[in-house]
Structures are given as structure tokens and as C-alpha cells.
Design a protein with these regions (language model features):
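The substrate-binding groove and active-site-proximal loops of carbohydrate-active enzymes
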Residues: 1-6, 33-46, 83-91
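Active-site clefts of carbohydrate-active enzymes
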Residues: 21-44, 77
Length: 185
């Protein structure tokens, strides 16, 4: 997502949904790991960061924040670093923005965690082509639903969603799988 290889990422998601959507529950969603630059170094502290962070916490699977990510720390952390070497000050603006935009989503993680009602959509442009840079998906739990739409490219996007991409459903009698699609409405 950082490198905006959106079509590749969406293809992986589609392949998982067509093979077995339950796999999505086992994924760990993260923005960085100890072998990489920190999340704020890779994504900044504004639109890109909060867009990807929103996806991280609203996709099925386990969202995992890196060490110091919410505070905006830039010092790498990992097993080869036994102690902190920098005296970093927490970025209170970044923390407050997490509290406003991300934490409420985490408090409702039950709405996003399951895969039984998770649907990924193609985002169509006015000329009928799929815009692979826009991630559109929905999920539902009991009588609550959520629709997430995020353009992971620094450009204008205009279009619509209607039908989900194909996902497999297991037949309980013979364990065979069938591909189906649903409409947003």
C-alpha cells in the first residue's frame, strides 16, 4: 500500500476471497515491522498515514501497531536494539488524531473483524473501468453495517460501487465451494 501497488494488493484480496474468505481473519494488518522504517517515516503523518491506518483497523484480521507508532516516534525498534537511544517527544497532535479517528474504529472492531459479511467491491469510473486505486469494502455484524472507501493514490477519484467481487461459500453437504457476488444494497 505504501508504494501504491494497489492492483496487486486488490488481486491478493480477491484471490483469498475466491479461495477461502476465512483466511482473512488470520491476517495481521500492520504498517511497518522492526526491519523497516517506522510508519510515520514511510507514510507521513497526514492523509496517507490515516487512510492506510483506517484500512488496517477496518479489514478483517488483527490490526497491529508498531512500537511508538501512535506517538509518532521515528527511532527503529527491534531485537537488535536493546534500549532507546533517542529522546523522542510524543507528537500530541498525532495522538489526538488517533483518538478522534482510529480509536473509535477499534472500539467497534467487532463490526470489522468477521468475514461472514465482508464484501470487497470494484470501484467503477464513469467510463466503466475499474479504478484499482480505490479500496471499497463493507462489513456487517447484527444490525450494524459499515462501508469503507479509500483512494490510495494522490489523485481525484470519481465513480461508483454496486456489486461485490466474487467470494467463495462452502456447501455444508459436500464441502464444495461456490463463487457468488452480492450487491451493495
Amino acid at each position: 500500500l505504501r508504494d501504491e501497488e494497489n492492483a496487486k494488493y486488490r488481486t491478493v484480496m480477491k484471490n483469498i476471497l475466491e479461495f477461502d474468505p476465512e483466511i482473512l481473519k488470520r491476517l495481521v494488518n500492520f504498517m511497518n515491522n522492526p526491519d523497516e522504517k517506522t510508519a510515520v517515516e514511510q507514510f507521513g503523518k497526514d492523509k496517507k498515514y490515516f487512510g492506510i491506518c483506517t484500512m488496517m483497523v477496518t479489514m478483517p484480521g488483527l490490526p497491529m501497531f508498531g512500537h511508538g507508532q501512535i506517538e509518532g516516534f521515528t527511532e527503529k525498534y527491534g531485537m537488535e536494539y536493546r534500549k532507546a537511544y533517542w529522546e523522542e517527544t510524543p507528537d500530541y497532535h498525532l495522538i489526538k488524531r488517533h483518538e478522534r479517528e482510529i480509536f473509535p474504529l477499534l472500539h467497534n472492531k467487532y463490526l470489522f473483524a468477521g468475514v461472514d459479511n465482508f464484501l470487497l467491491y470494484d470501484f467503477f469510473t464513469d467510463n466503466g473501468k475499474v479504478n484499482e486505486d480505490v479500496f471499497a469494502y463493507s462489513n456487517r455484524y447484527d444490525n450494524r453495517s459499515a462501508l469503507v472507501v479509500y483512494n490510495n493514490k494522490n489523485n481525484h477519484a470519481k465513480g461508483w460501487v454496486k456489486n461485490s467481487v466474487a467470494y467463495s461459500v462452502k456447501n455444508e453437504q459436500d464441502a464444495k465451494r461456490t463463487l457468488i457476488k452480492k450487491t451493495l444494497i
